[in-house]
């Protein structure tokens, strides 16, 4: 379990293809990240959220953590486009004794979205994120002023447009832009999206009209 509060931006040191993909099965990959001081207390087998994707540490050598990713995870997330030298959002799993500053984040990405527009104001930046037409039903999990996870970051939904653009908007303060990947992403870039856990369970329990 995570909270969506990013601890650090860390650099991808290497990427290798474990198994080649094709039109039916995506490639399986392994990659390593220099997680710096976040490696203290971590062990092989523990989980870290990388851009919002819950991954298991398969190797740990000093500050370098390695992860193996199956094809299904690559297909459903933005991990299909990561590059060596790129910086990613990192959060270690939450301790039971820790402060809960964000919201419940599992690290199970529901879908990806595209940054459709980026509007810069003096005190904030507004991002409009578009979700593909075939995932339009996912808007049942999105609540205005409710929580959503974008690239592992706990954020608040500002507006929803599920009629014309299949989009939602979020507002980012300078601190978030400086401390996360959303400060370096541009229009057209993909992002990982995880809908609010509570919304998903409530939607599952309630009868559909």
Label each PLM-derived region with a short phrase.
Residues 1-209:
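Conserved loop->alpha-helix
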